[in-house]
Amino acid sequence: PLPQEREQSTAVSTVSGSLKSSTATFRIRPATHNDAAQIAELFRRAVLHIEASHYSDSEKAAWIQGADNAAFWQKRIGRSCIRLAAQNDRILGFIEYLPEQNHLDCLFTDPVHQQQGVASALLSAVLPQADADKTVTADVSAAALPFFKKQGFILQHQNQIQRNGLVLINYRMILQTDSI
């Protein structure tokens, strides 16, 4: 089936996560075109929040250029599997999975809700869609390396991406689906 068909057939799940000092409930659900503006804003905030020890301000600006607008994310919502962690009408995080390639294209959490189980819940929501006996790949930022290692991903190699005259570094990581 097409990614849109997969999204419609996937049930919405409710997850308990720790938010600050209290326990709150958030839902994992498919993204809709109406979510695009909030996704763009969360993406922008998450990238700009990454520590300067990982990426400079100019690298972060190059990273978000062209992707911090609703139109960009509306196109992606239509062609891939994007899941959101949402609490009421607020998006706490999102993940984009490309099932045809068994590739996690992105995973971002609102800086206010990082280290609170949102990213783990999002990853758990899409990994069961991975083909059995295949490898799931992800190209992750330096800031995300510890999270993915903790989830069982193995570092494969460093990538160098040319963007706006800069070289951005990220890392190819893999996860064997038989270990899920």
Describe the role of every protein-language-model region.
Residues 104, 135-140:
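Conserved hydrophobic beta-strand within the GNAT/NAT acetyltransferase core sheet
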Residues 148, 153:
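Conserved active-site tyrosine of GNAT-family acetyltransferases
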Residues 30-33, 41-112, 123-125, 129, ...:
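Acetyl-CoA-dependent GNAT
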Residues 117:
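Conserved G/P- and acidic residue-centered "switch" motifs that form tight phosphate/ATP-binding loops
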Residues 91, 155-157:
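Residue-level detector of beta-propeller blades
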Residues 11-34, 176-180:
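Conserved N-terminal entry element of GNAT/NAT acetyltransferase domains
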